[in-house]
Regions:
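Alpha-helical transmembrane segments of multi-pass membrane transport proteins
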Residues: 1-213
Length: 213
């Protein structure tokens, strides 16, 4: 309730605060303890917002699953999130790299993973519970394409190196495909298709056969 009040009833802000709480609670905790802690402390905030004034036994299964998936997922991602980042520290011990830099790069490369839990809450059809095959196919395709756009925008490379404004466009288009509205999915798909064509053609021109003088 405190998190929901602090977020002013905003679903996105509530999810963001729950994400921070889950990352902190999950740092250094083994898997089972991680789930017990995050599901007990953080998940109720999401359920309070998604199913207000509803007894737990009457809350739809998919709503409960999405809330618990959200907190558990971020609890696990804490292993690659600085400053603790146990997995990154273990990897740096093997490679001989700097632990903090390894943690930062691991979080950067896995940026798409930080978006997936939001998609699960906003588009519960991804859990494949009480939905049609068509719904599953549609949300899965939009999720995958959206992740490609966001990932390329964050990394700064697709078929070739991206300009700063191209990165912003790709990230915005990818995020629009996460929002559970058909029109936003279509807009995002069209923008990403145009960006793909520009990248593909530009890369072909840059790497095409050179004229012999």
């Amino acid at each position: 309730n405190s998190l929901v009040k602090l977020a002013g009833g905003s679903i996105m802000l509530t999810l963001f605060l729950v994400m921070i709480a889950s990352l902190v609670l999950g740092m250094g905790a083994p898997t089972t303890a991680n789930y017990v802690i995050t599901s007990t402390i953080a998940a109720p905030a999401i359920l309070t917002l998604l199913a207000p004034n509803t007894p737990m036994e009457l809350v739809p299964l998919v709503t409960v699953m999405s809330a618990h998936f959200f907190v558990f997922y971020f609890g696990i991602i804490a292993d690659i999130t600085p400053p603790v980042a146990l997995a990154a520290f273990a990897a740096s011990g093997i490679s001989g790299g700097d632990p903090i830099k390894t943690g930062v790069h691991s979080a950067k490369l896995a940026i798409a993973a930080f978006i997936i839990p939001y998609m699960i809450v906003l588009q519960p059809a991804l859990l494949m519970v009480d939905v049609t095959i068509l719904q599953i196919v549609w949300v899965t395709i939009s999720a995958v394409i959206g992740m490609i756009g966001i990932g390329a925008g964050i990394i700064g490379y697709w078929y070739r190196k991206l300009m700063w404004f191209e990165r912003i466009i790709l990230i915005a288009a990818g995020l629009s495909m996460i929002y559970p509205e058909t029109i936003s999915d279509i807009i995002g798909l069209v923008v990403l298709a145009i960006m793909f064509a520009i990248q593909f053609i530009g890369n072909k021109k840059e790497n095409g056969p050179k004229a012999i003088a």
